[in-house]
Regions:
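Terminal, non-catalytic protein-protein interaction segments that mediate quaternary/complex assembly
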Residues: 1-177
Length: 177
């Protein structure tokens, strides 16, 4: 990114880039650019599992509300990019598990994180993730994540932790490795 990224708004960007995480359940995440906190990432996961978009819920779980969430919250203290709020919305997760359980070859097992009907809510808090798709290959659950933007230096560490837990949750619920 530093060498090949183009100046785009207030950052550097690369477009149409993909990568594979070979062992997503290994949550020993390191980042030389910042200190990563597994304790905080776990609290964020518990917040997502609560299905509650309120930053106050995160504060209850973690003991404080990180400044980034205060900045992103709407006037009611809700965060629209809370993955738990999004994946459980409209029974999406149940639908995905049902599709995978009934047909391991399904191409319908997808979660929508970004909801176009919520564009007005996204003024200060637009989800970076658009969608998550699940496929089964050799009885193993694979997951593909599609992002509109990826804060590789700061956000990705926590996102990877959350994504691995989403994959683990869906695998357990649908009976795949």
């Amino acid at each position: 990114i530093i060498l090949e990224g183009i100046n785009f708004d207030d950052t550097k960007a690369l477009f149409n880039v993909g990568f594979t995480i070979e062992n997503p359940m290994d949550n020993h995440i390191t980042n030389v650019e910042r200190e990563w906190s597994q304790k905080y990432a776990r609290a964020e996961w518990d917040w997502y599992l609560s299905r509650n978009p309120s930053i106050n819920k995160l504060g209850e779980i973690y003991g404080k509300i990180p400044p980034i969430w205060k900045k992103m919250a709407d006037e009611d203290g809700h965060v629209n990019s809370n993955y738990g709020y999004q994946i459980f919305r409209d029974n999406q997760l149940h639908y995905v598990v049902e599709k995978l359980t009934n047909n391991p070859n399904t191409r319908h097992a997808a979660l929508s994180i970004y909801d176009g009907k919520e564009n007005e809510k996204y003024a200060t808090d637009t989800p970076c993730t658009y969608a998550i798709q699940f496929t089964v290959l050799d009885n193993r659950l694979n997951m593909s994540v599609y992002l509109r933007s990826n804060d590789l230096w700061y956000g990705f560490c926590n996102d990877q932790y959350q994504f691995s837990h989403i994959q683990e949750l869906v695998a357990k619920m649908s009976g795949y490795d």
